[in-house]
From Swiss-Prot:
Taxonomic source organism: Leptospira biflexa serovar Patoc (strain Patoc 1 / ATCC 23582 / Paris)
Protein name as annotated: Small ribosomal subunit protein uS15
PROSITE patterns: RIBOSOMAL_S15
A Gene Ontology term for the protein's cellular component: cytosolic small ribosomal subunit
First and last residue of the signal peptide: none
Record keywords: Ribonucleoprotein, Ribosomal protein, RNA-binding, rRNA-binding
Family designation: Belongs to the universal ribosomal protein uS15 family.
Amino acid sequence: MITKEQKQQIIATFGSKPNDTGSAEVQIALLDSRIKDLTEHFKANKKDFHSRRGLIAMVNQRKSLLEYLKRSNLESYKKLIEKLGLRK
């Protein structure tokens, strides 16, 4: 689970303003950190299928936000992908 401090750090890193929580970049970065946390959780809890459903929903939401960002602001999309290390 993301702590309040981690969330503030992500918002400060990816946001355009100090309280920018609604931009696509910040939402994608927050989803990415939650997805990474859940992935670690599943290494220890392989049969937690209820949480797996939530993980799949988060991955799909991140995917749709990335598609939106790619359509609307390609330069910002490329920077975000590079910072998060999503594409290989």
